[in-house]
Amino acid sequence: MSQSLRIVFAGTPDFAARHLAALLSSEHEIIAVYTQPDRPAGRGKKLTASPVKTLALEHNVPVYQPENFKSDESKQQLAALNADLMVVVAYGLLLPKVVLDTPKLGCINVHGSILPRWRGAAPIQRSIWAGDSETGVTIMQMDVGLDTGDMLKIATLPIEASDTSASMYDKLAELGPQALLECLQEIAQGTAVAVKQDDALANYAHKLSKEEARINWNDEAAHIERCIRAFNPWPMSHFEVAENSIKVWQARVETRAVTQTPGTIIQADKSGIYVATGQDVLVLESLQIPGKKALPVQDILNARADWFSVGSQLS
């Protein structure tokens, strides 16, 4: 059994809460949790606690929610905890050097990609968007740069042809906690090995935007199909037809030469809506029209065949 560490955990969404749950079941002592301040959520815009806060309170772990770490009070508060280590998972706040240096062993971060391939805010989405064959989690020693710290552990898994950001999120939320526990054991035993990142291999995973999710039919069908999976569940790839914005939940690529203008419907039946692109054909299989849930194309055509007639132009 490895030595028990006094750990401060910092995180906010469900992805982080799954890591906290693993720590709470481990031999380590979780002495405090930091999470984002409660935010308005839902139709009523009621102040809502983060998943991490909810879990911490269920286990009677003290919770701190500073807006930032600029005040002396917030820095002194952290120092008074006398932590061995801070574990950071999708916290959402930048940590200044004084915070990184406060725990005896510094701060480590669980990042949702194989570093240095995708640094930044949207590594899961960008790995699918780019057509990567694998992804994973990297646990790194944090420094003042953005995901630039020395790597302590990498765990990988393949990206399947059907994976969306939603499915990869769930897979990494299972992979990450196990890798974290293994890394903590090595840190506690003094056997952890830090490996520097090769900055020449780094890419920045920019945040997604609704504008980016609008389908450009001039792109290759393979790229559009990857975007559809990368932008699921947010912001959802979409196009316009008959002055309606249509979300695309599922599509496939059919390799064949096309002569029609990109965005032109060349076939529409129960097997799919076939759309010309800059290269090959994109076959739409599941769509969501305004005010409705996502449906197979066959059902969409039963209700709105006039929107998707052969020769119609999608924009």
UniProtKB/Swiss-Prot annotation:
* Keywords, sorted A to Z: Protein biosynthesis, Transferase
Q: Which reactions fall under this protein's catalytic activity?
A: L-methionyl-tRNA(fMet) + (6R)-10-formyltetrahydrofolate = N-formyl-L-methionyl-tRNA(fMet) + (6S)-5,6,7,8-tetrahydrofolate + H(+)
Carries keyword Hydrolase? no
Keyword Transferase attached:
yes
Q: Which domain of life is it from?
A: Bacteria
Cite the InterPro entries for this sequence.
Fmt, Formyl_trans_C, Formyl_trans_C_sf, Formyl_transf_N, Formyl_transf_N_sf, Formyl_transferase-like_C_sf, GART_AS, Met-tRNA-FMT_C
Which GO terms label this protein's molecular function in UniProt? methionyl-tRNA formyltransferase activity
List its EC numbers.
Answer: 2.1.2.9
Naming one, the record's GO cellular component terms include:
cytosol
Stored Pfam families: Formyl_trans_C (PF02911), Formyl_trans_N (PF00551)
Binding, (6S)-5,6,7,8-tetrahydrofolate: 113-116
Do you know which Gene3D superfamilies this protein is assigned to?
Answer: Formyl transferase, C-terminal domain, Formyl transferase, N-terminal domain
Q: What is this protein's function per UniProt?
A: Attaches a formyl group to the free amino group of methionyl-tRNA(fMet). The formyl group appears to play a dual role in the initiator identity of N-formylmethionyl-tRNA by promoting its recognition by IF2 and preventing the misappropriation of this tRNA by the elongation apparatus.
Q: Which family does it belong to?
A: Belongs to the Fmt family.
Can you name this protein? Methionyl-tRNA formyltransferase
Whichever gene encodes this chain, its name is fmt
